[in-house]
Each structure stands twice: as structure tokens, then as C-alpha cells.
Amino acid sequence: HTAMQIVKELGIKINHDDYLVLSKEYIDSQQHPMKVLGEPRRPDAERAMARGFVVADCLYGFACNPCSFACPHGAITKSSTSTVPVIDYGRCIGCMECVYQCPGLASFGYDLKKEKLFLPVEYEVKEGEQVWLVNNNGERLGEGVVEKILHKPNNTLVACVKSQTIQAGDLTKVRGFIVKDKYPEPLEF
């Protein structure tokens, strides 16, 4: 990721898709990730209700750390390439910068008081669309509406989604959304 920023600052044009392929090939060649966590870490209930926060759904330790560089408050650390990110929820202010920077789309933002989610998205979605809130398996957990699409120069979009049916701590089970009219029908065999 840092190399891509340097190239852009130098004014050199590079195809973003080519960069992603090269980045994936490099990461794949350097490691064999091991599962470190069974479930992502979350803040305690009191902290979760106090202000926005992020959850890094990184369960495997490998050489990836853009989230730690992205955090302007130093709230995300990795002690080695074989560990997962650790979020200091005392320092995390819920700015969501790490959500934009995660190449694995594994960082998710939450504001439980406002019942809002900040979810990375790589497909076209419009503000105002009604969505199904889903878990990592694509199973429907609830309903929401896309309030805003946040754009950053690195080509990762973050959708600010207002939950209409899920409240408080249950929001942290949500890992994405599917526009209602694009939700696939179950296959019958």
C-alpha cells in the first residue's frame, strides 16, 4: 500500500487492478497464514456505547498492517507479521481511516448509539438504497439503508449504513450488506 502511495505522489500512473494483483502475489509468496483468533476482538459494552469504534475481522496472522499505519491515533498495533492487529479501544476514536485502508476488507466500523455501520464496499451502490445487513456467510441479519458513500483516493469506498432493525451490540455481527433487489434467491436442487 505504501508503495502505491509513493508512486501516486511521484505522479506515475499505474493501473490499480495490476497493483492489486501484484500485491496479492507478493503476500501469497511470503507466508502461510496461521489462524490466531477464533473470533475478532471487540470493545467492552460500556466502551462500545460511548463512541464509534472498529473491529478488525483478522483471524489469521500474516504480513499485512496498513490499518496500523492508517490510524492517526496509534490505536492499532501488530507486534509481528504472524500476529493479528490489536486495537486499543481507549485510543480508537472511530475515525474509520483503517476501514478505508484494509486491503482485505476486514475492518468494519460501528456507531452503536446512532445504529450506524461503516462497511467497505467494492461494487456500485447508491445512497438511499434499501439493503439486507449480512454476516460473513451472506445470511440476512437485518435491514438498513445506505445513507452515504464515503470516497477516498485509494479506491476503497465505505458505505455509511443506518440499521433499521438491528440494535446495539448485535450490530457488530454485521460484516456487509446486499442491496435488497440484488439479493440472490436460494438455489433448489
Model-predicted regions and their roles:
Residues M4-L10, I87, C95-D111:
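Short, structured interface segments
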Residues I14-I27, E39-A63, G74-G94, G109-E124:
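Ferredoxin-like iron-sulfur electron-transfer modules
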Residues P66-H73, I93-Q101:
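C-type cytochrome heme c attachment motif
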Residues W132-V134:
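A generic structural signal for residues embedded in beta-strands
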Residues E139-K152:
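Short beta-strand-centered aromatic/proline hotspots
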Residues K152-Q164:
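Short, solvent-exposed secondary-structure boundary/capping segments
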Residues L171-F189:
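Intrinsically disordered, low-complexity, charged/polar segments
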